[in-house]
Amino acid sequence: MKRISTFGATLLLVAGLFGCGKQTVVGPEQLVILIDVSDSIEPAAEEQAFSAIDRVIAQRQRGDRIAVIPITGDAQAESSGRVIRFEVPTVRQAYDNDLRNFRNNLKRSLEEFKAAAMASPGSRTDILGAVALAQQEFKFRAGSSKKSLVILSDFIQDDSELNFLKDMRLASKAVAKEFAMQSAKATAIDLRGVPVYLGLLRSKGYKGMRRNRREAIQQFWIEYFSSCGSTN
């Protein structure tokens, strides 16, 4: 976990990892994508993120599993019932009709998911709660031989308990690092062996934010996922 990249670079990297190296992986792969649907994300950035997700999922191979989880203001109450899951067909039909049907269903489901998210974006952002849902997805599909987590967000945690825009534990990198380690211990998230890719979406939340806090927010997430056992 080195840094937070632009969402485009992150999605391109994941597409390459899940495509070009396919022959070296035994068994199905699992990809979980968390996408921030709060109103702090600029609409154009949200549109681009959904388009990129569509492209990445369409490149999956037979047997691969994908879950897309919205990042809302309360993951347990609002996000858990809105997860969409896809599994690429394993049994080939004539002329690859199964893949054609899969991609048509995929496109329709993503369009419905996006329309619902953009029609009524939430005012708050529970990224930590969404990560907990991602861990549940990985445990539910324990047979996958390779797992990856992609998070597309502005990474400004803002729920009923924590607000990265104001919390003094996000005022400097040193304090943020310590806070991240404490948070990882408190949440008990286990991502050992799971690479995590952080894609930064353009957000209204960063307007007027001091540089020290921006850097502290990035440091928090880098240290948090490292403390959770992420491998990259």
Language-model features: locations:
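Acidic/histidine-rich, surface-exposed loop or edge segments in extracytoplasmic proteins
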Residues: 28-40, 110-116, 199-204
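Bacterial signal peptide processing site
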Residues: 21-23
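Bacterial N-terminal signal peptides that target proteins for export
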Residues: 1-8
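C-terminal motif of bacterial Sec signal peptides marking the signal peptidase cleavage site
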Residues: 16-19
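VWA/integrin I-like adhesion module and closely mimicked acidic/polar interface patches used
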Residues: 156-216
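Von Willebrand factor
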Residues: 27-150
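Sec-exported extracytoplasmic/periplasmic mature domains
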Residues: 54-62, 111, 132-143, 157, ...
